[in-house]
A protein has these predicted regions:
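Acidic/negatively charged segments and metal-coordination signatures
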Residues: 1
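Short amphipathic secondary-structure patches
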Residues: 5-59, 81
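Glycine-centered secondary-structure boundary/capping sites
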Residues: 27, 31, 63-65, 101
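Signal peptide-directed extracytoplasmic domains
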Residues: 54-66, 70
Length: 260
């Protein structure tokens, strides 16, 4: 039942009925009898619990007159705000009143000031230097995701300059890797699709530095051009993924943890 509650938790907190159905379907597909499993969503739709009973043979207790009996197993999965993630992309977005399905600019082009902040750097267009400065490191991290953990409160250096060619190559690669049918959209997407970007939500932290306030997920849609036209846009998602959960700021990206 551990895997069943983890499967169901993917739909919390927004769709508790579907969470129960997903957990039941997963349990039944793995040999649990329907009449021997009970499921419950609780904690303001942020937790799901399963209890399953199974008939087992008692080998060593037979000398006491017990041949078989019911063994119960329970599991609980909890969802909460992500406070640390792996695989983030080197783009930073400042806090908005994020709305599901709305399009946001994750990197601007030269001459566009949607997210530029003079407190950070006049030459900053939204890119982050997660492993150090340089276009090659930036492109690798944008293409494949950062191979390390980021957490709320971390101070990050920004990657100055427009770096349009590395940005376009990386996003084009991610979009080409979406081989799902139908093509992933905000209403119907695979949770492992490369078009999904884990993006740090940031605030200024001094010259050429920013501080992580939380994390958000976006479905990347386009990187239309180069130079002044090289911007990255994505639609905001509310979803559950793997990662450390806690009491930090929530921006729609939640993690799941097995707590029992």
């Amino acid at each position: 039942v551990d895997a069943a509650v983890l499967a169901g938790a993917q739909e919390l907190p927004h769709n508790p009925e579907l969470a129960l159905q997903q957990a039941e379907d997963y349990a039944l597909a793995n040999g649990v009898e329907k009449e021997k499993i009970s499921l419950e969503v609780f904690n303001d739709n942020k937790a799901i619990k399963a209890q399953a009973n199974k008939e087992v043979e008692f080998f060593f207790a037979r000398v006491l007159g017990f041949n078989s009996g019911q063994v119960a197993h329970g599991a609980t999965a909890l969802v909460g705000n992500m406070v640390a993630v792996n695989g983030a992309v080197p783009l930073g977005i400042q806090e908005h009143n994020f709305q599901f399905g709305e399009q946001y600019t994750l990197k601007v082009g030269a001459g566009d000031t949607d997210i530029l902040n003079e407190e950070v750097s006049p030459g900053w267009f939204g890119a982050l230097a997660l492993e150090g400065p340089g276009a090659k490191l930036y492109e690798d991290n944008l293409t494949y995701g950062f191979n390390g953990e980021l957490k709320i409160g971390d101070i990050l250096d920004v990657q100055t300059g427009n770096i349009s060619n590395p940005t376009k190559r990386a996003i084009d690669y991610r979009m080409a890797q979406c081989t799902h049918s139908p093509y992933c959209t905000v209403d119907d997407y695979s949770r492992d699709c490369p078009k999904l970007l884990k993006v740090p939500v940031i605030e200024p932290a001094g010259h050429k530095q920013v501080r992580i306030k939380g994390f958000a997920m976006f479905l990347v849609e386009e990187v239309p051009g180069q130079g002044n036209e090289n911007f990255v846009k994505g639609r905001f998602l509310e979803t559950v993924t793997t990662g450390e959960i806690g009491t930090g700021s929530g921006f729609g990206l939640m993690g799941v943890k097995l707590v029992q």
